[in-house]
Amino acid sequence: MLCAEAPIHRLSVEDVRRMVDAGVLLEEDRVELVDGVLVDMTPPGAEHSATVAWLTRHLVGAAPRHEVRVQDLLLVEGGFLMPDLMVVDPLPRDRQPSTAALVIEVSVTTQRYDATKASRYARAGVSEYWIVDVPARTVQVHRRPGPAGYGDIARHGDGARIPIGVGTSPVDVSAMLG
């Protein structure tokens, strides 16, 4: 039987937790669980890390009533994603978020993969989803989530100031991208 013909055993979030508990996966392994399949994430480079650091500093000050989480799990239908940043309502320490006010993916080489996540974030009720395309110096902003995806998608470039739905201070694209 060819692999393409064989049934696939899909993992659950609980399966992955047991794998971590057994030492099969390490907590620091960079994976996402998409439709029950573990997907390796690209290791962050210098540009990616600098952009995430800038956004983290900005969001902590701009959204004081929320938690800013960096590369943490967001539970979604069929698994979990690990966005670069998310702004969530405060939760008890033993709970992972299943939605967010804002999710940001910083893309240096992963633009196409990050674009495929939009429908998952919309179905999870994420109010805003941003894809920061570092090489293109643009930010694609998705708003108005629904079952079929986001109803409003706009692209912003150098010189733009993007308001944050939960924040008090807009993001200056030029300052963010250096």
Locations of regions flagged by a protein language model:
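Gly/Pro/Ser/Thr-rich low-complexity, intrinsically disordered segments predominantly at protein N-termini
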Residues: 1-178
